[in-house]
Amino acid sequence: MAGSSIGQLFKVTTFGESHGAAIGCIVDGIPPNLEICEADLQHDLDRRRPGQSRYTTMRQEKDQVKILSGVFEGKTTGSSIGLMIENTDQRSKDYSEIKDLFRPGHADYTYHQKFGHRDYRGGGRSSARETAMRVAAGAIAKKYLNEQFGIVIRGYLSQLGDIKADSIDLDEVENNPFFFPDLSKITQLEDYMKALIKEGNSVGAKVTVVASSVPVGLGEPVFDRLDAELAHSLMSINAVKGVEIGDGFAAVSQKGTEHRDEMTPGGFLSNHAGGILGGISTGQDIIAHIALKPTSSLTIPGRTITTNGEATTMITKGRHDPCVGIRAVPIAEAQMAITLLDHLLRHRAQNLHVTTNTPFIK
């Protein structure tokens, strides 16, 4: 399986399966002398951790991260950082009945056809359990970005099903179990999710992630444009079926006079492009949105086939998220951080000496 790494100068390689002994990752390229400890990583891991509310999976994992290498006396050494989290609450017996059939809407069928042998317990390598290590690596990237460049990355759930945030108050995001920025919609979200869980169904979601104070110049045209790399990074998150940068698909109905981000000596007059023009950061906020499908792990019977190709029906047992978008918020933040740090290091390596007579605007 060759697709377990992301990044060039800042590179993250993850390993492990949902019901294996542990999950882990190797982080390469972080500069030396960054003060870091396990507590710095644990904050975001706790935000992603399962079993924290009735609206997410009841799998109880503490997600206690261990730093195995690359840190000495509280500082990064510049060598590879090894991270590991033990799996402690696997219930593999919940999956014994699906050993010889494929869950519709999951990676069971495609993994089986591609590799000829799959770990059916909780989806194995295809499980979102793996994303805990992305969050751990992303926490390192977020700390470096903030301390060295003042970059702040914030994510929130901007839509759950048909319920959209009408106002954005980032101070409210961490004060409710949905990471939702509109306090007036929390009761509606709670009632909706209770009914959804009772029904045994699931729903999709939209997550927005914003990076502020990103310097101008990040991105490597033409194939490694910053927006292309961000789309690749965010699209790699489980259940993501769409990515927008800035206004995204809303640009289809806009006219050029509306969409162009006009400039004045005092700065840009709008940010429809989401902080990226020509594949290069403008210095404005970088804004991305991801669409996550509803999980197919349902207690409502659905049609499928066995590994022998025979027709059958099934329900999914086990513990699952009725809306995977809720816990995707810190994952999206991590993916943005990993990609931005990689491009900052690449830009610094090639273009640190570049100067122009044009003042920077935002």
Swiss-Prot record:
Residues that hold FMN according to the record: 125-127, 238-239, 278, 293-297, 319
InterPro entries named in the record: Chorismate_synth, Chorismate_synth_AroC_sf, Chorismate_synthase_CS
GO molecular function, one term: FMN binding
Record GO biological process: amino acid biosynthetic process; aromatic amino acid family biosynthetic process; chorismate biosynthetic process
Cofactor binding note of this UniProt entry: Reduced FMN (FMNH(2)).
Any single GO CC term annotated in Swiss-Prot or TrEMBL for this entry: cytosol
EC numbers, comma separated: 4.2.3.5
Reaction it catalyzes: 5-O-(1-carboxyvinyl)-3-phosphoshikimate = chorismate + phosphate
Pfam family name, one: Chorismate_synt
Domain of life: Bacteria
Enzyme class, broadest EC rank: lyase
Pathway annotation: Metabolic intermediate biosynthesis; chorismate biosynthesis; chorismate from D-erythrose 4-phosphate and phosphoenolpyruvate: step 7/7
Chain residues that bind NADP(+): 48, 54
Keywords, in A-Z order: Amino-acid biosynthesis, Aromatic amino acid biosynthesis, FAD, Flavoprotein, FMN, Lyase, NADP
Cofactor requirements of the protein: FMNH2
Function (record text): This reaction introduces a second double bond into the aromatic ring system.
Family: Belongs to the chorismate synthase family.
NCBIfam families listed in its UniProt record: aroC (TIGR00033), PRK05382.1 (NF003793)
PANTHER family referenced in this protein's UniProt entry, alphabetically: CHORISMATE SYNTHASE (PTHR21085:SF0)
Subunit structure: Homotetramer.
Entry protein name: Chorismate synthase
Species the sequence originates in: Psychromonas ingrahamii (strain DSM 17664 / CCUG 51855 / 37)
Name of the coding gene: aroC
